[in-house]
A protein has these predicted regions:
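Conserved anion/nucleotide-ligand pocket segment
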Residues: 1
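Residue-level recognition of oxygen-bearing side chains
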Residues: 7
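Short beta-strand/turn micro-motifs at beta-sheet edges
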Residues: 57, 167-168, 214-218
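Active-site "cap" helix and flanking loop/linker of ATP-utilizing ligase/carboxylase catalytic domains
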Residues: 79-101, 116-190
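Glycine-rich active-site loop/lid that clamps phosphate-bearing ligands
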Residues: 182-217
Length: 219
């Protein structure tokens, strides 16, 4: 990110130096809260299977530190973001399968950072979304890819009523779900204190990394 005029020449030269075409593209910085949205598309319908607040820190490097569901954004802005996502999916010609968006709500309204024909990576589609909605969207995506109807999704989803290029539905969040990343400092982890006590907290759903940490620290 170029923060002021003094960084412009250096940044452009660095970009060109590392470009095969020896060109660079300058794009507007989109300022505003960011969201991750997952959806499944088939038979003229688009079902939102997850909508999470995305937590980005440490500019100008923009490190993703986690997600939280359900979102805190207002319903009107929520609908605007979903409609923009649906228009992007339509423009890309995605008619069957998964779609995901990283999208911001700026002073000019929704602005798309990315739309991809896949589910969210990391822990999102496998853990964070299902923990919030009690819905296995990975299974539903596979069913659609195999030409089958995602019956569980059809039972859980509810229709959204606003103008969009698809018949819109959503699978709503039932519980709060969040995942967070830890940024380490230089050095070697020798011990972790209080881990056993924290893991007995009823609000902790998954502890894979905690088990791994105990193994590492015991070596």
């Amino acid at each position: 990110m170029i923060r002021d005029e003094s960084e412009l020449i250096f940044s452009v030269n660095e970009a060109i130096k590392n470009s095969r075409s020896k060109n660079c593209i300058l794009e507007e910085y989109m300022e505003g809260p960011e969201f991750s949205i997952d959806a499944l598309v088939y038979d003229g319908t688009m079902t939102i299977t997850g909508f999470a607040d995305r937590h980005i820190f440490f500019p100008p490097y923009f490190i993703e530190m986690g997600h939280t569901m359900p979102t805190r954004i207002s319903k009107d802005k929520y609908n605007e973001l979903i409609k923009t996502f649906a228009l992007g999916v339509k423009a890309l010609g995605l008619t069957t399968g998964a779609a995901k968006a990283d999208i911001k709500y700026t002073k000019n309204g929704p602005m798309i950072g990315e739309i991809a024909a896949r589910l969210s990576g990391g822990y999102m589609s496998g853990w964070t979304f299902p923990y919030s909605s009690d819905f296995n969207l990975t299974k539903a995506a596979i069913e659609i890819s195999c030409g089958k109807k995602p019956l569980e999704m059809e039972k859980l989803r509810k229709e959204l009523f606003f103008d969009a290029p698809f018949k819109m539905y959503e699978v709503s969040s039932k519980k709060v779900s969040a995942e967070r990343a830890w940024i380490s400092i230089p050095g070697i982890v020798k011990n972790v204190y209080g881990l056993d006590e924290k893991l007995h907290n009823e609000n902790i759903k998954n502890k894979l990394e905690a088990d791994l940490m105990k193994e590492i620290c015991s070596e």
